[in-house]
C-alpha cells in the first residue's frame, strides 16, 4: 500500500466576515422582536445525549435537530438570554478587531456587577463556557472562528511550509523542536506540501524518536504529536490537512483503551462536541498500532503491562481501563471484526502495550521496521 | 529600571566527549578492581533530604557530600550494581551514536531476562529511573548530557535566532505558534539575540495574549511559556539564556501558591533535583507578578478566587493551597520582607488571583500597562 496525497474535498474556509454576518443577523432578529413589542428569543440546539446520533453514512457523531427556545421574558431564561447577548457583543468585538481571547479571558472580561444591583453577569467560568458552546451550535461556527481560542498542546514536524499571517516557514527546518500548534489554526495556510501522509503520534517521546530516526524525511511523512488526547487545534489541523490538502491520516497510539479512545476522538468526534464533528473529526483516518496482535507478532510479551482497574467479571468491576474498554466495544464505529478482535483480546489478556515498548527491539526498530512494514503491507485498522 | 543584556558568566558547555570520558574512567576503575581481585564498588552521593542544603552564598539548593558505597559482592547491592553497569553501557552507546532516548525507552531497551535465570534486569521503570539519577550525581552531568531526554513542554517566541544542528531560524517568525522546546536543549545555540530580557510565563493563554499584543517586539522581550511547572528543558534553557547569553530573567505566574512554587523552582531548583541546581536553576531571576498587592493596586477584588484546601487554623488543615503556602513561608529563599508580605497576605485573605483576571480591565491591559509599568518602575520581587 503506497500512501499518496489525494484530491481535496474541502476548501480553506476561514472568513471572519461570515461570522460577523451571522452574529449581526441574529442580533437584528432580536432587535426587530424588541421593536415589535414581542418577547425576543433564541433557538438553541439541545445539548446532551438525547440529541446526539451516529450518522452511519457520514460515519460521524452528529447533533440532532431538537431545539430549545430561550425567551427574554421568562424568569428561568432571562439570565442566560442576557449572557448570550453579552458574549455575542464580545465575540463581535474580538472578530472585528482581529483579536483572540481564551475561554478564561472571555469569562473575566465579561464579569461585572450589573449597575444598581448586586447581581454579577457571570459568577463563574462554568456559566460562560456553555453559552459559548450554545453560540457555536446556534451559529454553526467553531469557537475558534469566533476568536475564542482553545487550550494549546501538540507540535508538528515535517516537510511542509506553514503560513501564519506574514510568517512562512518549513516545519522540517526547526531543529528537533518542531512547530508548536497554536490554539487556533483556522487562519493557517499550507503553501507547500512535500509529504505523502500524516502520522499522528500520541506521545512526545515517540514523536521525538521518529524525528531523530529521520522517519519524516525517509517516509515523506508529517509527524503530528498530540501529547495525550488531541487538542481541538490539533484535531482541526488533522481535519484540514486531510480534507483541504488531501493527505491520508494514520494514527499511532499506545495499545490500550486510552490510546484507542484518542484515535476514536480524532476519527469520529466526541459526544460532548457532536455539533463540531463535521469540522473537527476525520472519519477516513486509519490506525496503525499498537494492537494486541502486535504483542505476539513482534514478541513483546515480556514488556506488556497489566490493564488498570477491575475487570467486568470481578466484584466492583468494570472500572478504569476495563470500563473504557467495555464502552469502546459498544461504539458503533468499532463494530467491525478488526476492532472487536483487538478489544476482546485486550479484555481476555488484561494487558496493554506502549509505543515505547518497541524500544525493547532497538531504538531504530519502530522507524525502520515496525511502521514502514505495517503501512506498506496495509496492516491498518479501519 | 531598564533591562539590558549583561555579560555572560558561563560558556556553551555541551561536550559529548567529556561525558564519554567520565563514563570510561569510571568503567576502567571497576575493571581494574576486578582484575586485581578486589570487590568493585561505586561511590554514589546520598539522596534524600539529609544530604541537601541551601547554599546562602550561591543562593542555590545544593547536594551535600555524603556518599554511599555500592559493592558488587554484597547481596544487598549486587542488583543495583549490575543495573548501574547496564545503564552506563547504554548511555555510552547513545552518546557515541549521537542518539537520544526517553527514560521510558531506556527502561524498555534494557529490560531482559538474565540468561539461565528467571531474573529480569529491571522489573519496572521505578528501578531504572533512580539509577539514571545516581549516574547524574556520580558523574556530575545532566541526564540530558547523557542523551536521556526529559518530558517536553513549553514554547518560545521572540526575536532570537536558534541553531539546532543544521537548522537555523528566528523564533519570532513562526506565526503565533512559536518554537516547541525539545526535551534536550544542551546542543542548541543562539547565533543572534535581539531581545533585552526573557519573560517566563506560566500559562499558554497568557503567553498567547502577549504574542497577539506584540509585546515581544515592542518590549524587546523573549517569551517562554512554561505551560504549568517548568519542564527540565525549559529550566535549562532559562539558565543558559541567563548565564551564557546574559539575559535578565523575569517570571510572570498566577498569584497563588502554585504559581509561586513554579517561580521558586526556576529560581532556586528543587529538593528532588538538588544535585542539578547549578545547571538548572537561575537564582538571579526576578518575579513581576501576580502578587497579592496587585489585587488592590489594580482593583481586581471582584475577580479573585478562593484558595483551595483547609486553612491552618481550621480542623484538618492546612491542606491544598494552604499547605503549600505554609511551606513557602518557610523556604529560606522567601525569607525577605517582600515575599513574607505577599505570602502572609494570601494566608490572611484566603484568595488567589490569576494572570488572566487582568483581562477584566481589557485584553491589552496586561501588555500595554501592567507589565511595562511594573518592569519600568522596578516593582519586582526578589
Curated annotation (Swiss-Prot), chains A, B:
It is an enzyme of class 5 (isomerase). Gene3D superfamilies: 3.40.1360.10, Winged helix-like DNA-binding domain superfamily/Winged helix DNA-binding domain. Keywords: ATP-binding, DNA-binding, Isomerase, Magnesium, Metal-binding, Nucleotide-binding, Topoisomerase. Its cofactor is Mg(2+). It catalyses: ATP-dependent breakage, passage and rejoining of double-stranded DNA. Mg(2+) binds at residues 202, 254. InterPro entries: Spo11/TopoVI_A, Spo11/TopoVI_A_N, Spo11/TopoVI_A_sf, Topo_VI_alpha, TopoVI_A, TOPRIM_Topo6A/Spo11, WH-like_DNA-bd_sf. Residues 14-155 form the Topo IIA-type catalytic domain. One of its GO terms (biological process) is DNA topological change. Coiled coil: none annotated. It holds the Pfam family TP6A_N. The active site is at residue 108. CDD domains: TOPRIM_TopoIIB_SPO (cd00223). GO terms for cellular component: chromosome. Its EC number is 5.6.2.2. GO terms for molecular function: ATP binding; DNA binding; DNA topoisomerase type II (double strand cut, ATP-hydrolyzing) activity; magnesium ion binding. Relaxes both positive and negative superturns and exhibits a strong decatenase activity. PANTHER family: MEIOTIC RECOMBINATION PROTEIN SPO11. Homodimer. Heterotetramer of two Top6A and two Top6B chains. Belongs to the TOP6A family. This is Type 2 DNA topoisomerase 6 subunit A. It comes from Pyrococcus furiosus (strain ATCC 43587 / DSM 3638 / JCM 8422 / Vc1).
Amino acid at each position: 500500500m503506497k500512501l499518496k496525497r489525494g484530491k481535496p474535498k474541502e476548501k480553506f474556509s476561514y472568513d471572519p466576515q461570515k461570522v460577523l454576518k451571522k452574529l449581526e443577523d441574529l442580533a437584528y432578529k432580536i432587535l426587530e422582536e424588541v421593536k415589535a413589542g414581542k418577547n425576543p428569543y433564541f433557538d438553541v440546539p439541545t445539548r446532551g445525549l438525547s440529541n446526539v446520533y451516529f450518522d452511519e453514512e457520514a460515519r460521524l457523531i452528529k447533533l440532532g435537530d431538537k431545539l430549545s427556545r430561550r425567551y427574554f421574558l421568562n424568569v428561568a431564561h432571562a439570565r442566560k438570554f442576557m449572557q448570550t447577548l453579552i458574549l455575542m457583543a464580545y465575540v463581535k468585538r474580538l472578530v472585528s478587531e482581529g483579536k483572540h481571547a481564551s475561554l478564561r479571558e472571555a469569562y473575566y472580561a465579561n464579569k461585572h456587577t450589573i449597575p444598581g444591583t448586586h447581581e454579577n453577569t457571570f459568577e463563574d467560568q462554568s456559566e460562560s463556557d456553555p453559552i459559548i458552546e450554545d453560540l457555536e451550535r446556534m451559529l454553526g461556527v467553531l469557537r475558534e472562528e469566533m476568536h475564542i481560542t482553545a487550550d494549546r498542546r501538540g507540535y508538528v514536524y515535517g516537510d511542509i511550509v506553514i503560513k501564519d499571517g506574514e510568517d512562512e516557514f518549513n516545519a522540517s527546518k526547526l531543529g528537533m523542536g518542531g512547530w508548536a500548534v497554536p490554539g487556533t489554526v483556522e487562519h493557517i495556510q499550507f503553501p507547500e506540501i512535500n509529504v505523502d501522509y500524516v502520522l499522528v503520534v500520541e506521545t512526545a517521546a515517540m514523536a521525538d524518536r521518529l524525528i531523530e530516526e529521520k522517519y519524516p524525511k525517509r517516509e515523506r511523512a508529517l509527524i503530528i504529536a498530540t501529547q495525550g488526547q488531541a487538542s481541538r487545534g490539533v484535531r482541526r489541523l488533522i481535519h484540514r490537512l486531510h480534507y483541504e490538502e488531501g493527505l491520508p491520516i494514520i494514527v499511532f497510539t499506545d495499545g490500550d483503551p486510552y490510546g484507542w479512545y484518542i484515535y476514536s476522538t480524532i476519527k469520529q468526534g466526541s459526544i460532548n462536541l457532536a455539533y463540531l464533528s463535521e469540522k473537527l473529526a476525520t472519519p477516513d483516518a486509519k490506525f496503525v498500532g499498537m494492537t494486541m496482535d502486535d504483542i505476539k507478532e513482534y514478541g513483546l510479551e515480556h514488556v506488556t503491562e497489566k490493564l488498570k482497574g477491575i475487570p467486568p467479571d470481578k466484584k466492583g468491576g468494570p472500572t478504569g481501563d476495563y470500563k473504557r474498554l467495555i464502552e469502546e466495544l459498544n461504539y458503533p464505529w468499532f463494530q467491525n471484526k478488526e476492532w472487536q478482535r483487538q478489544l476482546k483480546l485486550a479484555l481476555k489478556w488484561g494487558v496493554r502495550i506502549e509505543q515505547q515498548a518497541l524500544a525493547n527491539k532497538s531504538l531504530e526498530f519502530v522507524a525502520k521496521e515496525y511502521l514502514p512494514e505495517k503501512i506498506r503491507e496495509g496492516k491498518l485498522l479501519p
